[in-house]
């Protein structure tokens, strides 16, 4: 079994000052385009979410009839299109369904679908551990 360990990242919080969050620097790719991006590892997110600019960089295509709205915590709905991309975590690359946001103001989220069933993911002592 192999492990990839990411230290939590310290970030500013309006409520708590400094907090440590589970962020993993992962490679996301589509065809010949790839980018190293900091994803929040979010066990509460159904899908992996990427902002409009990243999907555009990856050459994802918009189809008006495929736009749907998703909603997380809070009342705001976000228009997205579901697409496939590859994510590499350590030495393992998997294809995942991503929700490509058609707005920019969304965080990069690594959600459960296609990810959590390919890895054992452990949140422990300010570290995120991926085992495969």
Language model region names:
Residues 1-132:
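Pepsin/retropepsin-fold aspartyl endopeptidases
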């Amino acid at each position: 079994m192999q492990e990839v360990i990411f230290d939590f990242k310290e970030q500013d919080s309006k409520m708590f000052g400094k907090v440590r969050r589970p962020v993993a620097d992962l490679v996301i790719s589509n065809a010949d385009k790839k980018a190293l991006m900091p994803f929040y590892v979010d066990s509460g997110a159904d899908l992996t979410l990427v902002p409009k600019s990243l999907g555009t960089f990856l050459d994802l295509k918009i189809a008006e009839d495929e736009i749907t709205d998703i909603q997380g915590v809070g009342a705001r709905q976000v228009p997205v299109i579901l697409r496939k991309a590859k994510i590499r975590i350590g030495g393992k690359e998997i294809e995942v369904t991503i929700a490509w946001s058609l707005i920019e103001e969304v965080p990069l989220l690594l959600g459960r679908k296609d990810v959590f069933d390919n890895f054992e993911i452990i949140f422990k002592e300010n570290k995120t551990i991926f085992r495969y």
